[in-house]
């Protein structure tokens, strides 16, 4: 599950280098979509699995994404590409740590 999150976030990050300011909102919505899907997927896990190491990884990854979405929303409103890239780098570091 966490690997899938990583792959999808890296995909968004690659698009970030190519986008203009109007695309920031689209990419942020895509990131929020990943978060929603992973939260729904976690909710369908059997209760025992939610408490396992895999469930903990999923919760940690979701927490990092929630934090990132909030920060990216603020940055996107200001259209600050450099800060957005710094935040995406932080997201990647946190996901690698999970």
Regions picked out by a protein language model, each given a short descriptive name:
Residues 1-98:
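Feature detects long, helix-prone N-terminal segments enriched in hydrophobes
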């Amino acid at each position: 599950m966490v690997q899938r999150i990583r792959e999808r976030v890296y995909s968004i990050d690659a698009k970030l280098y190519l986008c203009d300011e109007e695309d920031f909102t689209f990419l942020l919505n895509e990131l929020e979509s990943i978060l929603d899907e992973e939260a729904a997927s976690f909710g369908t896990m059997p209760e025992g699995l939610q408490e396992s190491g895999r469930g903990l990884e999923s919760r940690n990854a979701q927490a990092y994404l929630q934090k990132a979405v909030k920060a990216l929303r603020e940055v996107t409103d200001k259209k600050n590409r450099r800060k957005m890239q710094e935040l995406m780098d932080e997201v990647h570091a946190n996901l690698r740590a999970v």
